[in-house]
Curated annotation (Swiss-Prot):
Residues 4-65 form the HTH asnC-type domain. PROSITE patterns: HTH_ASNC_1, HTH_ASNC_2. Residues 23-42 bind DNA. InterPro entries: AsnC-type_HTH_dom, Dimeric_a/b-barrel, HTH-Siroheme_Decarb, Tscrpt_reg_AsnC-like, Tscrpt_reg_HTH_AsnC-type_CS, WH-like_DNA-bd_sf, WH_DNA-bd_sf. The keyword Nucleotide-binding does not apply. This is Uncharacterized HTH-type transcriptional regulator PYRAB00690. It comes from Pyrococcus abyssi (strain GE5 / Orsay). Keywords: DNA-binding, Transcription, Transcription regulation. Pfam families: HTH_24. GO terms for molecular function: sequence-specific DNA binding. Coiled coil: none annotated. The keyword Transmembrane helix does not apply. It comes from the Archaea.
Amino acid sequence: MRKLDKVDIQLVKILSQNSRLTYRELAELMNTTRQRIARRITKLKKLGVIKKFTIIPDLDKLGYMYAFVLVKLRVPSEVDAMISEISNVEYVKEIEKGVGRYNLIVRLLLPKDLKEAEGIINEFLQKIKNAESVEVVLISEIKKFEII
């Protein structure tokens, strides 16, 4: 992968805060031209640095909450198989490999209704095979969320 410079990183940081800015607005913020911004964004997309432009919804207002499921597998080498097993589960929104106490960190999108959320969590936990330990953490409020 080609090395990114300070301008590329600054552009990604600005877009991660507001991806709706126009090329003109970005150019003004970065003291450059629209054409340079367009070329850099095209380059960043081709390199896979920018995967998509999206929004960050207010889950509380939509009636949802997050839960993190922290998993320590008995056989750490089976983490990729576990990822394949759970990747297509509808309410699984993020899967991360961990180094340290947990091999796997999974973010679930759950309804705020605790009975319904409990049912989904229990259903998900049935899919976790070969776990030495599992912890579930319900997220009551997100105080800060930044991508980069």
